[in-house]
Design a protein with these regions (language model features):
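Catalytic cores of alpha/beta
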Residues: 99-109, 160-175, 227-240
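Core AdoMet radical
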Residues: 28-48, 52-142, 151-155, 180-185
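Conserved, mostly hydrophobic/aromatic
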Residues: 21, 62, 117, 145, ...
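Anion (oxyanion) recognition and catalysis
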Residues: 85-86, 146, 266
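Canonical Radical SAM [4Fe-4S] cluster-binding loop centered on the CxxxCxxC motif
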Residues: 6-44
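Auxiliary Fe-S-binding modules of radical SAM enzymes
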Residues: 172-276
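A general structural detector for well-ordered alpha-helical segments in enzyme core domains, enriched
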Residues: 45-48, 76-84, 103, 137-142, ...
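Conserved strand-turn element in the central/C-terminal portion of the radical SAM core barrel
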Residues: 67-70, 141-165, 184-197, 219-229
């Protein structure tokens, strides 16, 4: 019986980003119609963590919009992490942009076990999807994460017009980092964003198979865009090599109802992991 890891996301600061990532609705430059707010209350975050635990999630990710983990964001995330861990037995993940070693050490001391920072795509293609910061800054953050003893979760977004060569270059870069987890996102179109999706189900299955074969020791996560590219046939991606999904909503896009995902997983014979 294949074991599947479930991860829930809490977008604790939404839509306040000045970067120009062409795939992201949280950038203020594109004017996407999303829910924007500065900070969720700590009480709300704790309640969401409890709900995630009830939905069998073994990981709970605290996500903030913006380029980097600045001092104010660091204080907020640490406070949220400590509050959650007082009441919920769950693995905490942070996703707060580029970060230096000292800030990451503080997160670790607050109870963060995993840090998610995606390279998104190849070094060569990155300038075509973002001009306000570099791919190298992202790679450096990933190295910082590993150097302080936090587990690295690092993946990308597919179907943004990248070539097969870009995907291979991206894989080669990930091999240097050896992440514990690799989220595979499939670009979600929005009428305000300047990109159009270049993916379909066959493409997505190929991506899953390719990454599962290249990274046999990593957790391969079906993340954003799962419902769009696979519809109700997303368990095919689990059989193709993925062993994790995001349960519940994404950052600004609605996900499937957790009870429906759980019902499908159990019905099709998958085991749900108790910890990650």
């Amino acid at each position: 019986m294949k074991k599947i890891y479930l991860c829930a996301i809490s977008n604790i600061r939404s839509g306040a980003c000045n970067e120009d990532c062409r795939f992201c609705t949280q950038s203020v430059r594109w004017g996407a119609d999303i829910n924007r707010y500065k900070e969720k209350s700590i009480e709300t975050i704790v309640n969401e963590a409890k709900l995630a635990k009830n939905n069998r999630a073994s990981g709970f990710c605290l996500v903030t919009s913006g380029k980097s983990l600045d001092e104010k964001t660091l204080e907020y995330v640490c406070s949220a992490a400590k509050a959650v861990l007082k009441e919920v037995d769950i693995t905490l993940i942070a996703c707060n942009g580029t970060a230096d070693k000292e800030s990451l050490k503080e997160l670790k001391n607050a109870g963060i076990k995993i840090y998610n920072h995606n390279l998104e795509t190849s070094r060569e293609y990155y300038p075509k999807i973002c001009s306000t910061h570099t791919w190298d800054e992202r790679f450096q953050t990933c190295e910082n994460i590993k150097s302080v003893g936090i587990r690295l979760c690092c993946g990308g977004i597919f179907g943004m017009g990248e070539s097969n060569e870009d995907i291979q270059s991206f894989i080669n870069s990930l091999k240097q980092l050896k992440p514990d987890g690799i989220p595979l996102n499939f670009f979600i179109e929005n009428p305000k964003l300047p990109l159009k999706a270049t993916h379909n189900k066959e493409f997505a299955i190929n991506i899953v198979t390719r990454f599962a074969n290249e990274f046999k020791e990593a957790i391969i996560m079906l993340a954003g865009g799962r419902e769009i590219v696979f519809g109700n046939e997303w368990t095919e991606a689990l059989r193709a090599g993925a062993n994790s999904i995001v349960i519940g909503d994404y950052l600004t896009a609605k996900g499937e109802k957790p009870d429906k995902d759980l019902e499908i997983l159990i019905k099709e014979g998958f085991e749900i992991a108790d910890e990650c």
